Amino acid sequence: MAKKAQRITLYKKIWGNIRKYQYLHDLSDEELAKILELTTRTLYTYDKDPSGLTLKRVQSFIDCSGMELDVLTSA
């Protein structure tokens, strides 16, 4: 019996792309936390489970980064 493939949720895609942007633009965790208006501890929580990521946080990131939502949600 084949093992079911684990799905990547939209939360994980968005969070992964935010972390990718952070890496490519050489932002510290503190700088990213300031952009998203949260604490660095919450960043680490989102690394484990990004389902707590809100639209307000995503919108804050889009406003600061200039990234389009469709790019943020792409794989």
What do the PLM-derived regions correspond to, one by one?
Residues 1-25:
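A short, Lys/Arg-rich alpha-helix, primarily the initiator
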Residues 15, 44-45, 73:
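Key DNA-contacting residues within the recognition helix of helix-turn-helix
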Residues 21, 35, 46, 75:
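Residues in the recognition helix of alpha-helical DNA-binding motifs
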Residues 23, 34, 63:
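Alpha-helical residues within the helix-turn-helix
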Residues 29-33:
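Short alpha-helical "recognition helix" segments of helix-turn-helix
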Residues 37-53:
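Recognition helix of helix-turn-helix/homeodomain-like DNA-binding domains
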Residues 56-71:
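DNA major-groove recognition helix of helix-turn-helix/homeodomain DNA-binding modules
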